[in-house]
């Protein structure tokens, strides 16, 4: 059944009404801008990614949506292949800054099994994207696994490691509730760039130079959220089987990896 949710965008700070509706087989995940005449839509696919600075942006014709990674991570982990998402603003609601709200909405709406065979891209050789000391690699693997290492100079963060098999159970327990991170010293700069206008101490893990201003949900919440972003960004390629190993990866590197895999499909 359809289900709705209202909130504000993390970066835009704009209010948004979202309606999640069942979609036929082989539709994919489709965002529909109901605030634009003609209700233009954009399919959640790597070919439609146009920007990866601080968030992942999709664009097709007049339809543009950004910061889609938290929604996409929930759809990926909860095994949702087809859904229409109607939005009257360009950015999904931030919720609590994680994917937990979207996991809850999926469970509340219910999941309908469809009869078309699910297509899965099985990785048969390694793909690697490097950028200085940052990298993301995918290797052949029987299943879907994410191993992420985050390195941050903040004294309370340092090096964090995360390793998990992507399944509805593991995602809900270990990953979905991890929130995006922010630093007070960057806030003015980000807002001058039109970003982080909807960020608060409740929907982000916020640090000043010495302490965490939010209440952490995990000791390693930062790296868990980074792994969440990988799940969301790579679902723009589709379902995959492989082992992703990442060090300080970003939306840009995640998208470049998806494009590298796409070239062989």
Annotated model-derived regions:
Residues 1-81, 86-265:
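C-terminal regulatory domains involved in ligand/effector binding and gene-expression control
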